[in-house]
Amino acid sequence: MTVPLKRIDKIRWEIPKFDKRMRVPGRVYADDVLLEKMKSDRTLEQAANVAMLPGIYKYSIVMPDGHQGYGFPIGGVAAFDVNEGVISPGGIGYDINCLAPGSKVLTEHGYWLKVEELPEKFKLQGVKVYNLDEGHNDTSNVAFVAEREVETGEMAVRVTTESGRIIEGSEDHPVLTPEGYVYLGNLKEGNLVIVYPFEGVEYEERKGVILDEDAFKDEDPQVLSFLREKGLVPLRWDDPRIGTIARILGFAFGDGYLGEMGGRLTLTFYGKEETLRELKKDLERLGISANLYVRESIETTSGHSEGKSLSIELRVTSRSFALFLEKLGMPRGKKTEKAYRVPGWILEAPLWVKRNFLAGLFAADGSIVEFKGNTPLPINLTQSKSDELAENLVEFLGDVAKLLAEFGIETTLYEVKSKKGVTYRLSIVGEDSIRTFVERINYEYDPEKKVKGLIAAAYLKLKERIVKEAHEAVKDDFPTFEEFAKERGYEGGFVAEKVVKVERVKPEYTKFYDIGVYHEAHNFIANGIVVHNCGVRLIRTNLTEKDVRPRIKQLVDTLFKNVPSGVGSQGRVRLHWTQIDDVLVDGAKWAVDNGYGWEEDLERLEEGGRMEGADPDAVSQRAKQRGAPQLGSLGSGNHFLEVQVVDKIFDPEVAKVYGLFEGQVVVMVHTGSRGLGHQVASDYLRIMERAIRKYRIPWPDRELVSVPFQSEEGQRYFSAMKAAANFAWANRQMITHWVRESFQEVFRQDPEDLGMSIVYDVAHNIGKVEEHEVDGKKVKVIVHRKGATRAFPPGHEAIPKIYRDVGQPVLIPGSMGTASYVLAGTEGAMKETFGSTCHGAGRVLSRKAATRQYRGDRIRQELLNRGIYVRAASMRVVAEEAPGAYKNVDNVVKVVSEAGIAKLVARMRPIGVAKG
């Protein structure tokens, strides 16, 4: 999209309401150089999209450090009426990590779609997920599909497992391992990843009607009325439930009975309780109720005697649904005494529909996969009929054999002895055919058969690859199936596979894709592999560069030791996820109450380090589980601890109030709510995606999901966001405590004697309810600041009393090795930008692009030559955060200063950096 721009002055630009959906114009703060970068991505388009949201006031604003984000631009500000407006997680902070096009996403019906096909079809699809908490596979509807451009020169990561599975995506796409999620780019040869061995078949679209209303013209009108109400008639090939119907029918051909019971046509299923409970879920998806009964076993409809034991039956009392299945080919009466064939519509169906029918049939009457050592035994489908129907039985099993042959599965058919009637057995024989069956068809409903079949699929795929590569049979030390299942198998049929190759490859495509799911597991299965808030604080000292320079290496190394950092880093405090509710409610106060800081610290934090109204119950268990071990840790990427020297004072009067002087050593901390905050955003994106149609909110961009602020979903998200913000303040408070301890360790003085007070702490990914003036009237708004900082002017009651006469301190971190700034809030910001200004330098290169252009060891040496000592968890992070990967922060602060939306107070240059 080409976004028109109108120049207002040297550093202000307007995006006119060029699209009739825009409710307000856009306002961009940038010089010519900064604007060119915004034009190179979707920053301006995203700003225009934000201007379309209900309840927005004045402008959709982009700060000079703005760049493309998720939904909202990073560096974006928007204020919405608290009664008529919306709230959006994308406007507060969220990122996407992506897969290559062509990645096969497995759906609930056992077929796969390429990830890039999902935007058109996702409303109808349920995808397979791995329920981490319960340890089994599950199904979830898709919440959203995201895409982003492959950046110029960006490399993808291609990972190959020992069985030959390949996944390709961006370096930061998370993949599940036995130890948790790991970025694709961080995987190494020999690592284990979690795979779902089922491969399924490709989706095939089919149009037309399978069963129309004429089929019921001779039935009671109530039957047709019921089936219409359930959306089952007319039944079309493109009905998203057709796979469900096919597998129910398949199971019914095995362990189902359609017949009169008490003078009423009834449908009954027999089997193990856990099997019938799974079947019951599918019936309920169709809107059909069924009841489980425990009864004394009698001879079943298939003719097998079970003796006098208890059996379970699942009974559907809906006559309409029983007739529905009959019209689809289900025989009425005792199947051993009825002639029937596989229904014609199944024989004509796309392969994925046939797969569902067969998976249901084999769940009922097929044998479980068994092994002798490392060799699979035949999988058998055995059925019986009365003697006079022997030919029909052979024909029926012949139909099944033809279906299997379409998958490349070979079978043999033979008669077996039986005391009553005639019995035939259809056997899947040969290792290749057995592997194909468990990989592409498998079993539905019966958990025991299904799980064993999945692990068998992984085992046989690995065995096949080893045989092909070695050109000989597997050796004696190759594990038996039982050994493999015990060592590599997980509940739900998931398996751990070893990574054998990790490559950086040049993408032969232009876009990456990702999907979000509603399920709390927040993952999906691609190519068989399970895949998946912030702020700044400034601490002053009474030390000068002359005091610190001789000990800078020791100081930074001590900070690196005492403050946990890096991808997935965990804090020094061990809290179980059930124990962090107090942290989510009390924020920095919790930390101070528990000995991490001083009471006076709370007076120098935005919101006092605690937002009122945080509700820990609005935060998911998964978010708490991610956050608990990370409390008190820095993280990675652009998060840092930096020892800085104040090298220039622009406003001596304000600097004096802030406690800053030239030559002074200060410490800047940049980190946030870690995995907890990201999970909160993920959770509510999915919730809001579900709700957005209910509220009929315009949806100009699939990433720009929002709900009315006053809605139940909006208020619940706001409460969860507050909890995440409180977690972030507690996190920075604990880090502050360890920074003070580190200075004490190096300089042998108490932190109090070193004057280690907090200057201020600001959030820059947050939503706030504030009062602002619009068109001469005071209005309450929910201000979204995504990569933007609050900048309130002198006299504002939200500013700490010690700073109220001069305005709120605004902390602007630069990139690694460049200057950072302290600014002060202004009246200009209140009038133009809802009391907001920029938040940092803003990236010009993605992390991936930076690692291609820079080498971490060289950057570190260059910085050392300039007197800046860097200690990092990896050289890759140093390359990602190279100064050249960011905009010139001097230009950014110059723009906001010239615009009058912040006032320059002081500049700091780094002398030591600790990074994750």
Swiss-Prot record:
Organism of origin: Pyrococcus abyssi (strain GE5 / Orsay)
Chain sites annotated for binding GMP: 638-642, 764-765, 813-816, 820, 839-842, 915
Annotated cofactor note: Binds 2 manganese ions per subunit.
GO MF term list: DNA binding; endonuclease activity; GTP binding; metal ion binding; RNA ligase (ATP) activity; RNA ligase (GTP) activity
Note: Ligation proceeds through 3 nucleotidyl transfer steps, with 2',3'-cyclic phosphate termini being hydrolyzed to 3'-P termini in a step that precedes 3'-P activation with GMP. In the first nucleotidyl transfer step, RtcB reacts with GTP to form a covalent RtcB-histidine-GMP intermediate with release of PPi; in the second step, the GMP moiety is transferred to the RNA 3'-P; in the third step, the 5'-OH from the opposite RNA strand attacks the activated 3'-P to form a 3',5'-phosphodiester bond and release GMP.
Names of required cofactors: Mn(2+)
Stated name of the protein: tRNA-splicing ligase RtcB
Annotated InterPro entries: Hint_dom_C, Hint_dom_N, Hint_dom_sf, Homing_endonucl, INTEIN, Intein_C, Intein_endonuc_central, Intein_N
PANTHER family: RNA-SPLICING LIGASE RTCB HOMOLOG
Domain DOD-type homing endonuclease, chain residue ranges per copy: 248-409
Gene that this polypeptide is encoded by: rtcB
The keyword Ligase appears for this protein: yes
Substrates-to-products reaction catalysed: a 3'-end 3'-phospho-ribonucleotide-RNA + a 5'-end dephospho-ribonucleoside-RNA + GTP = a ribonucleotidyl-ribonucleotide-RNA + GMP + diphosphate; a 3'-end 2',3'-cyclophospho-ribonucleotide-RNA + a 5'-end dephospho-ribonucleoside-RNA + GTP + H2O = a ribonucleotidyl-ribonucleotide-RNA + GMP + diphosphate + H(+)
